[in-house]
Every structure is written in C-alpha cells, then in structure tokens.
A protein has these predicted regions:
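Cationic, low-complexity basic patches in intrinsically disordered or flexible, solvent-exposed regions
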Residues: 11, 36, 42, 56
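Intrinsically disordered, low-complexity proline-rich regions
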Residues: 12, 21, 49, 55-58
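Boundary at the C-terminal end of the N-terminal hydrophobic targeting segment
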Residues: 32-34, 74-76
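Extracellular, repeat-based ectodomains that mediate carbohydrate processing or recognition
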Residues: 75-513
Length: 513
C-alpha cells in the first residue's frame, strides 16, 4: 500500500501531515461508521485521554517533518468562470473573516452578505444582482460577534445569526469558565438595508458570572419550500461546548423570528470538548421539498445526520452516514500561511428532485482535496466520495475551505474552495468555483480569482460561503493582504499574522464563454 505520493517531487508540509494523519487513522482504534450502521450497534471510540495523547504526539512529529519539506506541484491554469467578477467589500484598513452571503429567491436581484472582524461585524446589500453594494452596520450601537450565518425567509426577510463571547473558556476546555456568551439573531425586513434595533436571543449565558458552557458555530436556515406544511419556519443549530463534551443544540421559530423555542439536544452521541481533539464541528441544515429537515455535522471521523419530519418538533436519533478524514488540519506550522483550516461538512438539496449533497475536505490522497457525496433516497444511502477538484491526484497541492450550493431553479451544483494547484510551493492561494450540471456526477473547475494571495499565519475564519439562483452564483471569502503590517489575526487566539480582507465573487453561467 502506497501512503505517500511517489516520484521525484518532495513532499509538502500538508502532504506529510495528511499522510501521517492517514497512518494515525488506520492505527488509532477509532469507530467505524459503516460497521455501526450495518450492525445497528453503538459506535466505540478511544478514551479522550488516549485520543489527545495521540494528537499531541502527531503534532510534534508533523512539525519536525514540515520544517524539512518542500512541494513540487504541476502548474495548472483554469478557464475563468463566465461573467466572473471579484469585489473587495471590506473598507480600506479594516479586516474581516467568516463571511456569509444569500440571495432572495423571490427577488433575485436582492443579495445580502455579512462578515466579522476587528470592527465587530458589517453587512452589505445589493439591489442589482451584485453589481453594486452598500455597506451597513446591522448591529447599530449594540455588539455583534462572530460565526455568522444568514438566510432569507419566504417573505423576503433577512435573518442573521451569530455568537457573542465576552470571554473564551480556559485553554484546556472551551466550555470551562467562559463568560457572557450566547447565540443571537438579527432581522432585516428589507433585504439587508435596515436592521432591527435589538437582536433576539436564542440562548444566552449572562455577563458577570462563569457560564457552565459556551455556544459556538450557529447556523440558521429557512423553510421556503412551496409545498411544505412548515413553510416559513426558521431553524437554528449550534455546538454547545461543555467541560467534558460537545453536543448539538437546536431551536426553531414558527413566527418569523419573533420568538424561538427553548433549545434542545439533537445529537445522540456526544463529541470531545475541543475542536482540535475530535469534537463535534460544522453544523448545517437544509429543507426538502416536503418540509423534511436534514442536519449534518462532523463527529471525529464521522459525518453525522439528524432528520426531522415534523418541522423540527422531533428528530430521529442522529446517525453516522459516512466516514471522512480528520476535519481539523491544525495550525500554521502544519498548513503553510494559514492559522488553521477545517474540512467541515456542508449539506444542500436539489429542491426539484430531493437529491441531497454533502461536501467536505480531507487528506485521504496525501494532500487536502474537496469531496462530494450524494443521496437519492432521503439520506439513507450515500454515493462513494467524488473528488471535486480536478488537478492531478497526489500532486501535493491543497484545496480547502469548500462551500456548497445548489441552484433551486435547475439543480446545478456549485462548490467553492481555496486552491493551490498553480503554485509549485503550495503557498499561493486562488479561489476556484466548480460546477456540476449532471447531479453531482462530474464537475468542471473554473478560476474565480486571477491574482493569488499569500498569508503568514492568517486567520481566514472557519468557512467561506456560497449561494446560487437562476445560473447566477455569489461567493464570499477572506483573503490575506500580504503588503500590510502584521496584526493580531485572531483575538481569541492571541496570535499574530497577516490580516485578511473580505471579497465577493460573482459568476453568471447564463453568459456564453
């Protein structure tokens, strides 16, 4: 069995990292999702202390390997996406990260986006399908935190969810001695132009006292399906970090965001308590044509799904649907230029057929690649992983931070990701847009950006974002600005690196090449 790419090329740090992670994967006694499903038995896994010791040992070895490694990547030039435009949305001198974007299906020229950063968060809206943008402050005089997500409902209202943290927990556990944290939702009645004076809390731990846990990575989505009995409902899920575990909490609103139900747990299995030790990560949900909800997340090596058939009142027990590589690629020492990278799962649905799609990134091939799996039977069975990026396999080039969208008007599948295939040193990063017109069976890769960026311990956030309607695609991502002075790139992490700005990409597949 060949573990490392063969030939004259030297291995990059990420390639060695991924190969070593694969060795850990086959030697560490982790649970098998496939076996668990087949046997209908509970999954087994090592103790937290065993898993943590293994990761610490791996980190030491990987750092030593990385310091002596370089990459040799074949130069590849992609065709530019049709009608491609790239706009810098963050104002000069301001940094940003964790950007989100959405289009109003009932008024497709109305597009809204938001992002976090040193200014606490901004939003922007467009009334002409992204040709021009107006920047606004959705928080007014109040605070707004990170880990944003955004959606339109069936009335054209915009809902922006986010977390607000006064103080992180101790280094050992996110949920230990955290203060003043919670999940909030802001509302705009006019497509992002104006925002309500106050945010609505979904779950809040008050200031001035240690909280028993910390809330993180909230994701909001809406039921806009014409034939759904739950049309108009809003749904929100997030990670609840506790001192000994991580779980998924869920809530819903049946009155267009005015109030939210008391959150409850939908993850049957609890993950470890931190993202770099095998915790639950990357929650996202979608709604089928009949109103069925599908929520996915990552739990160690498992992609897990929870399903609700009654508008979020109840959920079936969550279950692993397939296994992936480790979703956490560590810090800048193991992923050149980027402070940390996660291969979190995203889910989307073809509203015409009910076909489900899940994307993620992992390093099963020796470097980080983007993958997609599909289900045509409401999530019961899933196709083998399809590699979305089409550069030569095992070439040492990394593709990462993918996001998924399905055009509800025609079923075309789009995946956006950072791409290093054109740099022999595996440092310069472009943004690529992949498109499938055959229900996710094959993909064509297009260049979205022309000029690459190179970071130095840059914090890009934990995700990018993507949306599509009627052949017009909108993406949002962060890019390092290499010609500026170093700043604190992640306030909660206390590390220094190159700052990032926020970019919006537009592609129009209605235009001929």
């Amino acid at each position: 069995m060949t573990i490392f790419p063969m030939g004259n090329s030297k291995l990059s740090g990420p390639a060695i990292l991924c190969s070593f992670l694969f060795l850990i994967r086959i030697t560490l006694p982790l649970h098998s999702a496939a076996q668990s499903i087949a046997s209908n038995q509970p999954a087994t896994r090592p103790s937290f202390s065993t898993f943590r010791r293994t990761w610490r040992f791996r980190a030491v070895v990987l750092k030593a390997l990385f310091l002596t490694a370089t990459a040799a990547v074949a130069q590849v030039k992609l065709e530019r996406a049709p009608g491609a435009q790239v706009i810098t949305i963050s104002p000069p001198g301001q940094t940003g990260d964790e950007e989100v974007i959405a289009v109003d299906r009932y008024n497709p020229k109305q597009v809204v986006m938001a992002y976090g950063g040193t200014v606490g968060g901004k939003a922007a809206y467009s009334t002409d399908a992204g040709r021009s943008w107006t920047l606004v402050n959705p928080a007014g005089k109040s605070q707004m935190g990170g880990n944003k997500s955004i959606t339109f409902d069936d009335r054209g209202n915009v809902f922006l969810s986010y977390q607000l943290i006064e103080k992180l927990g101790t280094p050992g556990y996110w949920g230990h001695n955290a203060r003043g944290n919670g999940i909030w939702v802001r509302h705009s009645p006019d497509g992002g132009k104006t925002w309500g004076a106050d945010a609505t809390p979904a779950l809040v731990w008050p200031n001035g006292q240690p909280a028993p846990q910390q809330e993180d990575m909230a994701r909001i989505w809406a039921d806009n399906e014409p034939h759904s009995p739950h049309r108009g409902n809003l749904y929100l899920a997030w990670i609840d970090w506790q001192i000994d575990k991580s779980i998924v909490l869920f809530t819903r609103s049946t009155d267009h965001g005015k109030t939210w139900d008391k959150p409850w747990r939908i993850s049957t299995h609890a993950g470890f308590p931190r993202d770099d030790t095998g915790a639950i990560l990357g929650i996202l949900g979608t709604v089928g044509p009949d109103g069925t909800q599908y929520v996915v997340w990552n739990d160690m090596l498992d992609t897990v799904m929870a399903v609700s058939h009654d508008g979020g009142k109840t959920f079936e027990p969550s279950r692993p649907i397939f296994q992936v590589g480790p979703p956490y690629f560590g810090g800048a020492a193991s992923f050149p230029g980027i402070q940390r990278v996660m291969g979190l799962p995203e889910i989307a649905i073809d509203e015409r057929t009910g076909t489900l799609y899940v994307t993620w990134s992992d390093c099963r091939n020796g470097d980080v690649d983007v993958f997609l799996s599909r289900s045509t039977d409401k999530g019961k069975h899933w196709s083998p992983p399809l590699r979305v990026n089409d550069d030569p396999m095992h070439n040492g080039a990394d593709q990462f931070y993918q996001w998924l969208a399905v055009d509800p008007t025609n079923g075309d599948v789009y995946v956006e990701f950072y791409d290093r295939r054109a740099d022999p040193d595996n440092l310069k990063t472009w943004v690529t847009l992949a498109r499938s017109t055959d229900e996710g069976k094959t993909f064509t890769n297009y260049a979205w950006t022309v000029k690459p960026f190179v970071g130095h311990n840059t914090f890009l956030g934990d995700y990018s974002w993507l949306t599509a309607y009627e052949g017009r695609v909108y993406g949002a991502w962060a890019e390092a600005v290499s010609d500026t002075k170093a700043v604190v790139a992640c306030g909660g992490c206390g590390t220094v690196g190159t700052p990032a700005i926020i970019r919006i990409g537009i592609a129009d597949f209605n235009k001929s090449h």
